């Protein structure tokens, strides 16, 4: 049975979507089968994996609201073994439409169940909010990766996210665990980055991934080409960091 990992942090611009794209590509490069679920209405994971959003006929939105078969929403990517369920801007209004649906917190869990055995890993790119779709994503997940940006206010809002995870674990998904805190945009030359690294390690200890994602221009450039960094520049620090992260997750 495939492992479902949500990537969540309601603080924006922490590298959540970038990590989803590049971790998925790295796992696939290591011959794992991967499904990325883009649960963010901005659909950046979709475009970052080369999906032409204008040509998408069935997205996560249709699966949630219209009960469309999830298999109709799965698209292949340029990487063998890496598929995606794309997002759509309509997902912005989906939370209101979901309010009257039965078992509204478990819709994503239920729609992924038929394809769970088809993949080694399912990665859910959560919206940068703690709304109903993120609650759905965490309810569906076995574990959650929390990216933490090595910049000012890095830990801002994490206590709120951890409280949400605690509530979901108590009421909706007792198996939910923290896969790890992932330090992103790390620059060892900066005192601030090292201070944040030390602070996160002190707070969360063994829950912090050994791998850190260094600040790297290739990571920033790759989405503009609709490619994960491992295809854009396999020799870059960004590609090597995400490959190391994938290996760390596989070996857990």
What are these regions (language model features)?
Residues 1-252:
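P-loop NTP-binding core
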């Amino acid at each position: 049975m495939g492992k479902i990992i949500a990537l969540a942090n309601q603080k924006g611009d922490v590298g959540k979507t970038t990590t989803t794209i590049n971790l998925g590509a790295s796992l696939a490069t290591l011959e794992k089968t991967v499904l990325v679920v883009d649960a963010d209405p901005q659909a950046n994971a979709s475009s970052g994996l080369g999906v032409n959003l204008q040509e998408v006929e069935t997205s996560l939105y249709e699966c949630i609201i219209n009960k469309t078969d999830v298999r109709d929403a799965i698209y292949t990517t340029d990487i063998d073994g890496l598929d995606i369920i794309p997002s759509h801007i309509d997902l912005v209004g989906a939370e209101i439409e979901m309010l009257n649906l039965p078992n509204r917190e478990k819709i994503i869990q239920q729609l992924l169940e038929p394809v769970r055995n088809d993949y080694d890993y399912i990665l859910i790119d959560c919206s940068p909010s703690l709304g109903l779709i993120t609650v759905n994503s965490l309810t569906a997940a076995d574990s959650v990766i929390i990216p933490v940006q090595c910049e000012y206010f890095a830990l801002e809002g994490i206590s709120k996210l951890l409280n949400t995870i605690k509530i979901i674990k108590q009421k909706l998904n007792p198996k939910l665990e923290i896969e790890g805190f992932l330090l992103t945009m790390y620059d060892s030359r900066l005192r601030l980055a090292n201070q944040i690294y030390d602070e996160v390690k002190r707070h969360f200890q063994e829950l912090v991934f050994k791998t850190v994602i260094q600040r790297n221009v290739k990571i920033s450039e790759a989405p503009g080409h609709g490619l994960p960094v491992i295809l854009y520049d396999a020799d870059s620090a960004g590609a090597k960091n995400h490959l190391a992260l994938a290996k760390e997750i596989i070996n857990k």
